[in-house]
């Protein structure tokens, strides 16, 4: 590797909005994030299913038709 062209790597503290702190190496000093693996719904199991439905399902729901 060429000397003098690469950014300096330093210890970085990542702080989440929920209060969780992680330490890693990066070119930045501190990083603040809104979600992490401790508070994100996917990892905590509190996720909701977003079922928008297709065009046919919406039509059937709107006009009271059932699939029999």
UniProtKB/Swiss-Prot annotation:
Signal peptide (from-to): none
Disulphide connectivity of cysteines: none
NCBIfam families, alphabetized: L31, PRK00019.1, PRK00528.1
Family: Belongs to the bacterial ribosomal protein bL31 family. Type A subfamily.
Function: Binds the 23S rRNA.
Assembly and binders: Part of the 50S ribosomal subunit.
Annotated protein name in UniProt: Large ribosomal subunit protein bL31
Source organism (scientific name): Halothermothrix orenii (strain H 168 / OCM 544 / DSM 9562)
């Amino acid at each position: 590797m060429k000397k003098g062209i690469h950014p300096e790597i330093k210890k970085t503290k990542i702080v989440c909005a929920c209060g969780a702190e992680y330490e890693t190496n990066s070119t930045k000093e501190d990083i603040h994030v809104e979600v992490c693996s401790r508070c994100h719904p996917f990892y905590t199991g509190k996720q909701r299913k977003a079922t928008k439905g297709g065009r046919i399902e919406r039509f059937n729901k709107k006009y009271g038709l059932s699939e029999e």
